[in-house]
């Protein structure tokens, strides 16, 4: 992991968090998956064993280099990683008529933005697995997504830092 890359610092709870995200997605091996705000690619790499293909997008170039290296070192061939703004990436994918079956999104504390979410909705994933570290921006983004036809099916908090107010939340939305 490069010094400028983000990674969860609590490995025990991180494993629980990511396994819950994979469980919520209920992948069968046939899905096309996008891992947005993918960091070093951990969620996408885990999902790759349960999906047909995974595309990861991340703004931080060091994290993308780490994701590519992680895929290579683990001999994972059904994953591609791209460096760029997630909203712009999704907008371009939607404009080209691309679709996906499952979207994993793990945005920074500021949450996602309307450009990203509108493009995601246009691409029409059956399931969105949203991982959030900020309940306020999660509520804001869920409001947007539910107005666009998605329903919240499951919510699971994961305590990453005991005895603090910080919590990660995994949410499953579907149409």
Which role does the model predict for each range below?
Residues 1-175:
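Rossmann-like S-adenosyl-L-methionine
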